[in-house]
Amino acid sequence: MARKIQAIRGMNDILPDQSSVWLYLEKTVADVVKSYGYQQIRFPIVENTDLFKRGVGETTDIVEKEMYTFDDRNGESLTLRPEGTASCVRAADQAGLLFNQTQRLWYTGPMFRYERPQKGRYRQFHQIGVESFGMATADIDAELIILSARLWQKLGLLEHVELQLNTIGLASEREAYKAALVEYLTEFKDQLDEDSQRRLSTNPLRILDSKDESTQAILKNAPNLEDFIGEESQAHFDLLQAILKANGIPYVINRRLVRGLDYYGKTVFEWVTTHLGSQATVCAGGRYDGLVEQLGGKSTPAVGFAMGIERLVLLLETLNLIPDAAKFSTDVFVISMGDDAELASFVLAERLREENSNLVVLRHCGGGNFKNQMKKADRSEARFTIVLGQDEIDKGICQLKDMSTGEQQPHSIDDVATYINAKL
């Protein structure tokens, strides 16, 4: 027997018992973002490696340790996209959508990072991203956060997530703060965890969100980022808070929140939950005014966020918030006995679908006696089973069995669709 080929570790199949939940989540997101005027954009899974080195940052964990990178046959370095923002910027700028324009865009699809697989964290994972371009003021930051809050409300998650906010200021303000932070932490370098020691010379802001207890204890007396924030950045942050308060969006300010990608500035935010253990963040984003220019485009203000589909599905399942309507179910199972009845069953099944496009009609295929077909009808968990035989064809009727009650009655073939639609 040939050896079975398995899926790659950390890259999971989405099987039919879960795909209906994914479709429900994706449709809910699509409906919400459309109501705010966002249009979908799609871009390749594979990009030039330099896009992520320049966009995400060469000293980030993603670029240093987590990217799937390879050379093609022409020797060009390519990478499976580890996140969507840089690709969205590249695609929109290449198409001429950004300069002197405002754009509201969203996307969804798989991303790839070489990480240790664990619950809620995978090597192939799926994100939904929402990005706004051409608007530099805090009102668009607020719009995105309010949009995400509306999504949580639609999904029943609003009371189960918390919004955390921070401002990390302008690049010049961050540089001044980094210098002060490095100066302070250098005295304690040997006491920092291994990752923080490495980040001290590459990406010191990331030390702020270290999970190591000893490092956090050292940080208690470290310089505060808020002391380095200038008037412009603070005014931006104050307006954002005012808009959120006016719209009844609760939040907490987390001064240690810095985000892990180099392109962020001013506003950063995360939606976190206590229901998923260590994988607490379900949505994160912020402002990235310098990224378009950094990737070769004209200076363009921008802000956006991304959310992980796997984590959201896990959260919905953990909280038992998946509505019955989101689960796949069969409404009608059609069985037939005899050649004439088989032909008639095709016609009837199509008529049912024509009269109600939301109806799920499963028609038995593959032959078999009546008993075997009824067993399959039972296993389908359909609400109704339609039985067609030669006697029914001759009389212009079908037998309709309500599988929830066991009651079976004859119905006119012409009228059975109306009856079923009224009952469902």
Swiss-Prot record:
UniProt keyword annotation of Nucleotide-binding present: yes
GO cellular component: cytoplasm
The keyword Membrane is annotated on this UniProt entry: no
Localization in the cell: Cytoplasm
GO molecular function list: ATP binding; histidine-tRNA ligase activity
EC number: 6.1.1.21
Keywords from the named record: Aminoacyl-tRNA synthetase, ATP-binding, Cytoplasm, Ligase, Nucleotide-binding, Protein biosynthesis
Catalytic activity: tRNA(His) + L-histidine + ATP = L-histidyl-tRNA(His) + AMP + diphosphate + H(+)
GO biological process: histidyl-tRNA aminoacylation
Pfam families xrefs: HGTP_anticodon, tRNA-synt_His
Broadest EC class assigned to this enzyme: ligase
NCBIfam families, A to Z: hisS
Protein family membership: Belongs to the class-II aminoacyl-tRNA synthetase family.
Record's subunit section: Homodimer.
Protein name per the record: Histidine--tRNA ligase
